[in-house]
């Protein structure tokens, strides 16, 4: 499934899944919610409503620790790939956040680690 998004390359952004070392991109969940498959939507709706229900195994959910100026949290992440034009980087994770208020400047944020995979 492809999900076109408004991406923003932030050279100061760095997020990795600590167990695998995979690069992580950050996605604003409200901006893409209606474009995600139903199973992902249901799980993420529950996550952001503070449900403790486990994710369906087929989603391949990872929990990624995140530290920012807003504090520390765990973000749900799904396997993903990043494509910019003809360049494609697989083996990434897309972590979902639900900022208040949402930032209209971007839907997906990626850092240097993900950008290097596109080369």
Which residue ranges define each predicted feature?
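Pepsin/retropepsin-fold aspartyl endopeptidases
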Residues: 1-119
